[in-house]
Amino acid sequence: MLLAVAFVLAAASGVAHADEPKDFIDDARVFYRVVSCGNTAPVPADLDQATVDKHCAAMQKLYDTWHKTYAEPASKFFAALRPQGLPTTVVYPFGGGDLGSALVTYPDARDITTISLEHAGDPTRVAHLKKAQLREALSNFRAAIGGLLTLHDSTTENMLKLESGGIPGQLSFHITGMTAMGYEPVSLKFFKLEDDGSIHYYSQSEIDALAHRTAKKIKSKWVDTDFSEAFNNMELTFRKAGDPKAPLIVHRHIAWNLADKAFKGSPLEKYLLAKGKVVAMTKAASYLIWDWGFSGIRQYLLDNMVWMASDATGIPPKAAKKAGFKQTTYGTFTGPFLEEANKTVGADMVELWASQPKRRLPFRYGYPDMDKHVHLMITAPKETK
């Protein structure tokens, strides 16, 4: 009886239990204030205010560029194209660090999944950085995020630089994208996928138990991290800043290799299939969706998406046509800029753009082509007569 009473009292008092998911919202708010400069609240006592102020002044200039050259024109562009009644679930393969673009492309989204080789990262370090460490970490972060906020995609090199240290790349980039679009964090949790694709959120005791198991690179030609494998995958819940009644948006970043050997039949594939019909996007994806070794993620998209925005690294034209999709092109595409891209699909893409009227594209969306032209395509079901 006494144990039952104690349990009820503990529940009523809001005391966290050992098996409850650990919420790192306090750490997320530190990132929101110190790294992405989402508000002007005092910084944590251990951090140098002047260093943060200087960083935030530089960030504001990057945000101004982001909105002027990308968020504003792209938002208007997509608003005129998106059909009514699209799913509010977004899947963004090869979407490392690019939550901001997902919100630009799909502003009505409520569930967003980005997938890349990079791990989410440890959220607990930044609040304890010494002045010199903080200055260096913020400088490295700005150097990396600058490409995203000025060129609107994240390079592999920039992602790799932040796979270790006090300000991990995926966590910081996604919170920055959220901040750039006017949102604030509500919850931050970490998880793994069970064999059936369901989500298992880590409790504090599980995170403690994994503290000495360092996350390893997912692909051989990548880099190892210096943080626990508990921080591989993140779930960031957020809403419009200053509006407690605004709808919640859930973003999950999952560290996974999308090559067939790792994806087909995997917990990730099952997790994605459980979502039902989705909208999709990809850009700056190294032309991997063209590749025979990525047939699983390509087929998943063809079977489950109802609308997709991409640069030319999206679905190959012949595969799209066979699955009943029509592709509408914008800008100019004269060929992939990476020599290792599939040449047959590259030629098909050139033919696709050449076969359609030239439609203006007022912003960069992913890679430029081999001649530095911006381009974009929409893959959508063919209209039924």
Across the structure, where does each feature detected by a protein language model lie?
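Short, thiol/selenol-centered motifs that function as redox-active sites or metal-ligating centers
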Residues: 96-107, 148-175
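Short, solvent-exposed linear motifs at loop/edge-of-secondary-structure regions
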Residues: 1-3, 166-184
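Active-site/pore-lining binding-face segments in mid-to-C-terminal subdomains
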Residues: 176-263
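Non-globular targeting/processing and membrane-anchoring segments
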Residues: 19-147, 224, 228-230, 235-385
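Thiol-based oxidoreductase modules, predominantly thioredoxin-like and allied folds used
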Residues: 112-161, 186-212
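Bacterial N-terminal signal peptides
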Residues: 2-12
